[in-house]
Amino acid sequence: MSRRAVESLGETVASLPPREATLVTLPDLHPELSEALHKMGASRLYSHQLEAYERVRAGENVVVATATASGKSLCYKIPAFQNALGRTKSRSIFLYPTKALAQDQLGKIKGFGLPGIHPATYDGDTPQALRADIRRRSNVVLTNPDMLNIGLLPNHEAWGDFLRNLEIVAVDEAHVLRGVFGSHVAAVLRRLRRVAELHGGDPRFVLTSATIANPQELAESLTGLPFSLVDDDGASSGPRRVVFRNPPLLDKEKGERRSLLTEGALVFADLVSRGIRTIAFARSRKAAELIYRYAAERLGIEGARRISPYRAGYTARERRDIEGRLFSGDLLGVVSTNALELGVDVGALDAVVCCGYPGSVASIWQQWGRAGRGKDPSLAVYIAGRDSLDQFLFENPPRVLGRRVEAARVTMENPYILGPHLLAAAHEAPLDAEDERYFGPAYRDVAKKMMEDRMLAASGERLIYARSDSPARNVSLRSASFETVLIADTDGELIGTAEATRAPSELHPGATYLHRGNAYEIEDLDLRLHRAVARRVPNNFYTKPKVETDVEIVEEVETRGLPNGAALHWGRVRTTDSVTFYKKVRVADEKELGVYPLDLPDVTLETQALWVTLPPIPRGARPSFESFGGALHAGEHGMIGLLPLFAMCDRADIGGLSTPAHHQNRLPTIFVYDGYPGGVGISWRGFDAFSSLARDTVGVITRCPCERGCPACIQSPKCGNWNEPLSKTGAVDLLRYLLGQTSKYPAE
């Protein structure tokens, strides 16, 4: 890669040296497996692969946390294949977060050429006619959490022989199993343990993860079992140049910079035009399509033929075609969502461009790791977007380069998540008091609530499912809400779904809804029937709802003092959202086209929150709502903007409210709450790391070059109050007061 190509991109903030591999001889394996590894060029193993193998063979559950492209999959394949070649009845399940990754790994397993290994994918695309044969013949089944939930577990009797001989359960890419999705998967894995034991099975679990702060804790939280950690990476890596780039300022007063999408397209096109094989990662499907389109226009007809977008939503055939063309070198570049962040093999690449913060520092490293596999050199580029978290990382490269990665959290105490899985478990086999060992300390209370709701019924000392349907089919693994709204166009064709709790703000009559680059206007929303109807409209305006939020403190669980008599609290709250108006805004110039009233039912949410209380406003102080309320509001926005750096979540997963006098405590109060029923631990991370969160927020706001606040510091794209009022200087004064850096009350 030429020096000129790198220098054209911006400042190189780091040159990471290569790392030599630590190689060890193969252990005593079945001759066919040893021969297959030799033929594949793996005549020796990386040290971490051998350690994982030996620990699994010793009967331990193992989590492997090493870098991208370090051969983590061999850590579970070798023990699984060794078992199967030595005992014909031995069975394994390999669990992948996506069907695409399972298909990719199926090809790799077949590439071993082992006649005693009979792998098969088992997912929603598997024909019914093949499923019985898979249960009977396959000794390695590749599937995903969704299919485990609705396909295997409810039909465990048919899988009885397989489960009786189940010896290895591998969970690949475990770092993506966090928050709501991870908590659901934790319940699914515990249900798997339960039915396996019912049939006499006792599998070992092997989890692989990108580098995160708490791999062992995550593995134990997901499965409810003790784990050994393997994280001493023995794989080699080539030299890597790291470039951080900020789009140029267009308007200093407003803090407005060139679009992240435009900047990403410029960098991507420049690299591809130089023959550098590149992946650009975008944060959404729409962003990936737009970056590709802008880059194609810049490259011209011939250059555009060598690039492609890649995202979920394409057919399996389309994705395989793109992957194959990239692997073969026919394509020089791909613009992808995080669909390619996971381990689908696309061959040797030279450069990765992260277009904005992808949701975690761990994901940045995962994306960068897609280039320069083995000892090859690579280029890693991070382009900052306009929001506060992107700008914070641009200003603080050590937060990324120092690998200060986040902790991934799951919970088994959220009744909105655990409850549906207890119903599914009771349908699989009656529950009893012993099942607390699978489902944790919340089991008894949640089961009692399910009985009160007549979803479970007593049968002697056991609990049975009280209805005739299949409860597993009512579980959405990616939502903490029971209900979804179906969105159809005027011809009746389904174009999307949304959680019922978000429908009033996102699917109200008149709202714009985007689907595959097309704009729709919601004509009707029926919350009783959980249905919305949308019609195609020109893509030249968008809508913003006005949301009035109230927060009621239900239970204060933890509290601690802050400087100057302020206090920090954490506990359970009940939020009530009222969508009262919406406005139309023209895309071209952000001109407001009109404000329209709405009459919709309130949405309530019981969840977890942190809240900060200030002492009463000093006597004699007469702060205006714009100044003091704006300080509280801006401080709230600033902390919410950076909380994903601590909690490994998305900004949209968090809600907030600030008020100069809360109706329960009569004190100035800022709330930051989990945006999911029951909570998933996001606000707890903010409570636990509050001082660091507040300090980093001060740094973001003070370094931002805008005069009165912008999306890079205190404005929020999700604000239900349309970012009014906000005070940039007031937010800094407030946060410094809470940190004890000043004793001056922020209203004075």
Describe the role of every protein-language-model region.
Residues 378-380, 386-404, 419-433, 448-449, ...:
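Extended Lys/Arg-rich polyanion-binding regions
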Residues 704, 709-713:
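Short cysteine clusters
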Residues 170, 248-249, 616, 676, ...:
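Short, histidine-centered active-site or binding-site loop motifs used for metal coordination
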Residues 209, 714-717:
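Cys/His-coordinated zinc-binding microdomains
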